[in-house]
Amino acid sequence: MKLHYVAVLTLAILMFLTWLPASLSCNKALCASDVSKCLIQELCQCRPGEGNCSCCKECMLCLEALWDECCDCVGMCNPRNYSDTPPTSKSTVEELHEPIPSLFRALTEGDTQLNWNIVSFPVAEELSHHENLVSFLETVNQPHHQNVSVPSNNVHAPYSSDKEHMCTVVYFDDCMSIHQCKISCESMGASKYRWFHNACCECIGPECIDYGSKTVKCMNCMF
């Protein structure tokens, strides 16, 4: 009976998130998984807009670092107009602690028939290519993961300008969660990953000095 209740509630949550208008709704790609978890645990059932904030603290603790991005999904804060700040303009980046450069190079050499897109460009372009993109650094040494803005004037490791170094990145064709993005990039030996908030995943190779390309290029996950 309990499993049936959970299944029905999860379906209702997904239908609710799908029904919300695209221009005035929560960031479904970023929030759906965590919002479902918190709602299933009945931690976000109160309505602050109606004067009832009895669950606000518990809901905030459940959403943790995603509170700012996802509080509107559970009716805890005012909805945002995402047509002004599309999910593709934000991303989360993280350095992977056990990269396997030889594996990454082997998987990205030549043409592949796998569900990803390999892109290479000069490291100089990587360092100079600053778009209107807000990046968040996923920190793993905190009790709870926290997202902090990555400064635009990062100090990068020096590289020789007399030889053109290339940065190679991989974009998966389909949308995926940030957890799946990290696992997928680790499994192919990547050094870092960038997860755009529209759910596009980019794995970053060992020759890249910064966090790869700041442009969304996932074939089936562009918006």
Swiss-Prot record:
GO terms for biological process: regulation of BMP signaling pathway. One of its GO terms (cellular component) is extracellular space. Keywords: Developmental protein, Glycoprotein, Secreted, Signal. Residues 1-25 form the signal peptide. The keyword Secreted applies. Glycans are attached at N52, N81. It is found in: Secreted. InterPro entries: Tsg. It comes from the Eukaryota. May be involved in dorsoventral axis formation. Seems to antagonize BMP signaling by forming ternary complexes with CHRD and BMPs, thereby preventing BMPs from binding to their receptors. In addition to the anti-BMP function, also has pro-BMP activity, partly mediated by cleavage and degradation of CHRD, which releases BMPs from ternary complexes. May be an important modulator of BMP-regulated cartilage development and chondrocyte differentiation. May play a role in thymocyte development. Interacts with CHRD and BMP4. This interaction enhances CHRD/BMP4 complex formation. Interacts with BMP7. Belongs to the twisted gastrulation protein family. The N-terminal domain is sufficient to interact with BMP4. This is Twisted gastrulation protein homolog 1. It comes from Pongo abelii.
